[in-house]
Regions:
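Acyl-donor (CoA/ACP) binding surface of acyl/acetyltransferases
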Residues: 1-48, 71-202
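Active-site rim helix/loop that mediates acceptor-substrate recognition in acyltransferases
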Residues: 53-75
Length: 202
C-alpha cells in the first residue's frame, strides 16, 4: 500500500460522501460491506482477473479487513453492485524537486457484479472517481492496469479517456494462465479537464 497502514486515505477525509451521479451513489467502503462484496468477488468469473481471489470466507474476511480502507462501494437504488479502489502514490523526481512529487498520482481499480455489466454503470462510476481524484484530491495523473486478456477492463479505461501507455509481454504470473501480458493506461489532470470541457460543448 502506498500510504502507511495506520494512515487514513485522503479520499476518506473528503466531505463529499456519499457522492451521487446520474444513477449511482459512491461512498467509502465500510467493514460491514464485506458480506455483500463477498457475493460477487467470490465468483470464479470475477476472481479470474483479480490480483487476489479469496479461497474461503475466512480468507476474504481477513484480507478485506486489511484492505477495505482503500475501497469505495458503488450503489444502485440502495444495493451494492461493485467496488472501486483508490490508492495515491508519489511520482518520480530528481532529488532537488522530490518534494513536489509526493502523493501526486492515483491508481484506480474496480470490480463489478456480473449482472451490472453492459449498462454503463462502471463507466459512470469510474468517471466520477476520476473527477474526485482531479478536482478534490489534486492528483496530476491517474493510472490503471489490467491483464491484457481482460478486455472489458481495458475497454473501460479507454471509454473514460485513458490512453494506453504500455503493453508488457508476459510480465505477470496468473494463477491459471501462467505468465501473461499486461497493459497500463493513464490520464493527466489537464487531459481530464479538457475532456469534460469538450463534452460540455457537445
Amino acid at each position: 500500500m502506498s500510504e502507511q497502514a495506520d494512515a487514513t486515505p485522503a479520499f476518506r477525509q473528503l466531505s463529499i460522501w456519499p457522492l451521487r451521479t446520474e444513477r449511482l451513489m459512491l461512498r467509502p467502503a465500510e467493514l460491514s460491506d464485506g458480506e455483500v462484496l463477498w457475493r460477487h468477488r467470490s465468483l470464479p468469473e470475477v476472481g479470474m482477473w483479480l490480483g487476489w481471489h479469496p479461497v474461503d470466507r475466512e480468507d476474504w474476511n481477513e484480507t478485506y479487513t486489511a484492505k477495505y480502507a482503500d475501497y469505495l462501494v458503488v450503489e444502485l437504488d440502495g444495493e451494492i453492485i461493485g467496488d472501486l479502489m483508490l490508492r495515491t502514490s508519489d511520482g518520480w523526481g530528481q532529488r532537488e524537486v522530490k518534494d513536489q512529487t509526493i502523493a501526486v498520482q492515483a491508481e484506480l481499480g474496480w470490480t463489478f457484479a456480473p449482472e451490472a455489466g453492459g449498462k454503463g454503470y462502471a463507466t459512470e462510476a469510474v468517471e466520477a472517481l476520476i473527477s474526485v481524484c482531479v478536482e478534490q484530491l489534486g492528483m496530476r495523473r491517474i493510472e490503471a492496469g489490467a491483464f491484457a486478456e481482460n478486455e472489458p477492463s481495458w475497454r473501460l479505461m479507454e471509454r473514460v479517456g485513458m490512453r494506453r501507455e504500455s503493453y508488457s509481454v508476459k510480465e505477470s504470473l496468473h494463477r491459471d494462465l501462467g505468465w501473461v501480458d499486461g497493459v497500463l493506461y493513464a490520464i493527466l489532470a489537464d487531459e481530464w479537464r479538457e475532456r469534460l470541457a469538450h463534452h460540455q460543448k457537445d
